[in-house]
Amino acid sequence: MSITSPPIEVSVLTDSIKNLLEKNFLRVVVKGELSNVSLQTSGHLYFAIKDSKAVLNGAFFHFRSKYFDRKPKDGDYVILHGKLTVYAPRGQYQIVAYALTFSGEGNLLQQFEERKQRLAAEGYFDPKRKKPLPSGARVIGVITSPTGAVIQDILRVLSRRCHQFQVILYPVTVQGATAAQEISQAIQFFNQNSMGVHALIIARGGGSIEDLWAFNEEELVKSIVASSIPIISAVGHETDFTLCDFASDVRAPTPSAAAEIVCKSSDQYRQELQNLRRYVSSHARQFIAAKKNLLTHWQRHLASVDFYHTAQQTLDYTRAALERGIETKLEYYKQRFAQYRRWLKSDVLIRIEKHLADLNQSLMLSIKNKIYTKKTSLNQLYTSCLKNELLNLQHRTQHSRNILSQLSRRLHIAIASSQQTHQECLVRLQNELSFTIQHLLTKAKERCQAIQEQASSLNPKNVLKRGFAQLFDFNKHFVIISAESLKQSDLVRVCLQDGEAVVSVKEVWLNNDKKG
């Protein structure tokens, strides 16, 4: 822009800068330390990300709906995926993020998968080597922190479900550099000391992947596999999986569930096995197929419009999370199904089944009625869950549509404003161009008139009009401008204003001297 260019408004300049940034920095990945973190009630996250030399402000819209399990704080090192834009009211460039990863989690997940595949190949997770839980376990070893809520949950469940039981607590730290070693030592202690323990529970509450990393150590996996006492793993929440879960004989989604599993009666095992078999065979595939068809429908519907890529991305994340949850559920129920089959094959359960076969017809009828009642309850629960999932998906879809509608309206307003601004600028430029052309034409006319006047004053014919004459030789070959070129009796052609005349030279004078 030159110095003579007309001035523009601040908003126009800001919009130009914004367009340049968004066009050239559509996708960026940046890492650094968070500061000034603010999570609003609307679910939007505002922050600044910095390193030792620079600070960049940023925003993450709808953060709470995507990362509900962990809230970032000042000082966290993160990796952001997003785009650069300009916040016009402040004239400030910022990053608008659509994905956030806590620094270190990516490397830990890669280590987890590599270690899991290697140990699985070595046979540490082989279902054939897993030990069945004894029926009616009464002496239970618990390996966990003595001060947390986990041990209290286990004791509360055991007190409610079991009339006679004994818990032997081995206190350990469940997080940190020494946690895996302490838990391994606890397992060895129970195996080396004859204390009559029927089963062991390794328990801990939920946390991030860093918090649960002790349960992914190879040392702990090998100690679990080497144990002669059956081990129940109850680490983290239901969606958390550690290598301890894969190596243990039974995996429980929570510490409370571990206490329920360890003291279940044989008729409960039988009933749950039947219910799980019906549930897995009758509903799992239908549920997965229905969800995939629904997601495919919405994906095909929204993918046809490039402008709706944000909603498409949100639906993709939702579908991936849903598929992971379904796979996790299936893996969990498969493990429980295999475990129950092993229990039913044990000698104790065979004797129980033989005894149950001898019961009278009234007892069998009562059992069938209970099974029917439970089946009806499960069907109702399944129907309710499916309706809730569908309603939740509809709400999310409607929310995405509302967002897209708002963005569309904002885009139309922005386009109209931009067109008006460009139209005003075009009118101003046309006026300036007309003025400049008119000024140049006036100057050119004045210059032409001056040249015409000068040419007119130099025209010989105009000089003749003032009483002068022009002399030529008789044949008009050349102009006579000096008396020296004349001699007596020469014929000279004289050009006047209105004609010509031929004269004869009588005498010639040069500078008052007479010649010939």
Swiss-Prot record:
User: Can you cite an annotated GO cellular component?
Assistant: cytoplasm
* Reaction catalysis annotation: Exonucleolytic cleavage in either 5'- to 3'- or 3'- to 5'-direction to yield nucleoside 5'-phosphates
User: Pfam families, from UniProt?
Assistant: Exonuc_VII_L, tRNA_anti_2
Q: Which GO terms describe its biological process?
A: DNA catabolic process
Question: Which EC class is the enzyme in?
Answer: hydrolase
Which InterPro entries does UniProt cross-reference here?
Exonuc_VII_L (IPR003753), Exonuc_VII_lsu_C (IPR020579), OB-fold_nuc-bd_dom (IPR025824)
Q: Which UniProt keywords apply?
A: Cytoplasm, Exonuclease, Hydrolase, Nuclease
Under which EC number(s) is this enzyme classified?
A: 3.1.11.6
Q: Which superkingdom is the protein from?
A: Bacteria
HAMAP family xrefs? Exonuc_7_L
- PANTHER family, per the entry: EXODEOXYRIBONUCLEASE 7 LARGE SUBUNIT
> What family is this?
Belongs to the XseA family.
Supply the name of the protein. Exodeoxyribonuclease 7 large subunit
Name the species this protein comes from. Chlamydia trachomatis serovar A (strain ATCC VR-571B / DSM 19440 / HAR-13)
Q: What is the lineage of its organism?
A: Bacteria, Pseudomonadati, Chlamydiota, Chlamydiia, Chlamydiales
Q: Which gene is the coding source of this polypeptide chain? A: xseA
